[in-house]
């Protein structure tokens, strides 16, 4: 399909640790979203692409280069979703969109609320997807529970053993659900 939906996170981290929350979690969640679609046998209407960005921590050159290549190749990105706030329980999404698309996405909030995913707010979606600006692209960032994030963020404790597998999977499921809804029902 001609329209592209991006799901991604960044590969690089600070050298104090392996960067499991920042941003190994986002990388795993993004890949898991495609894995979930494949396991379900879902055939998307749009191209769903996982992008693992590089150099987010030191200039964002991976996101800038991806946007440059998308423009050069005349790719039509309609949606981009980034996970870069740790692998904790998902609590919502920050959404960069015009009013009509923000309202459309917010109308699905009731589908997420039983899982304590309740915060759908206008705001920045993420450093890696920020450079994408083709057409009326809608951008979103997964917002997990942030209570413990700065215990690990850019520290020597940001290691694999600090990531809760269940919370990581819940984040991947939330990303998959939002991507599915946009793919199936479209944007304004």
For each feature predicted by the language model, list its residue ranges:
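A mature extracytoplasmic/lumenal domain signature
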Residues: 11, 54, 144-146
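Active-site-adjacent substrate-binding region
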Residues: 88-188
């Amino acid at each position: 399909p001609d329209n592209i939906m991006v799901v991604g996170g960044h590969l690089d981290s600070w050298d104090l640790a392996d960067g499991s929350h920042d941003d190994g979690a986002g990388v795993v969640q993004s890949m898991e979203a495609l894995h979930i679609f494949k396991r379900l046998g879902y055939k998307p209407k749009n191209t769903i692409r996982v992008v693992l960005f590089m150099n987010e921590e030191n200039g964002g050159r991976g996101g800038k280069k991806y946007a440059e290549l998308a423009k050069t190749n005349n790719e039509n990105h309609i949606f981009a979703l980034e996970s870069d706030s740790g692998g904790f329980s998902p609590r919502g999404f920050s959404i960069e969109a015009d009013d009509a698309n923000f309202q459309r996405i917010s109308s699905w909030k009731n589908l997420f609320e039983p899982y304590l995913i309740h915060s759908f707010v206008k705001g920045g979606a993420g450093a890696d997807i920020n450079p994408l600006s083709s057409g009326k692209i809608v951008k979103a960032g997964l917002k997990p529970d942030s209570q413990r994030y700065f215990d690990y963020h850019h520290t020597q404790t940001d290691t694999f053993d600090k990531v809760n597998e269940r919370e990581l999977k819940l984040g991947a499921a939330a990303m998959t659900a939002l991507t599915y809804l946009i793919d199936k029902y479209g944007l304004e």
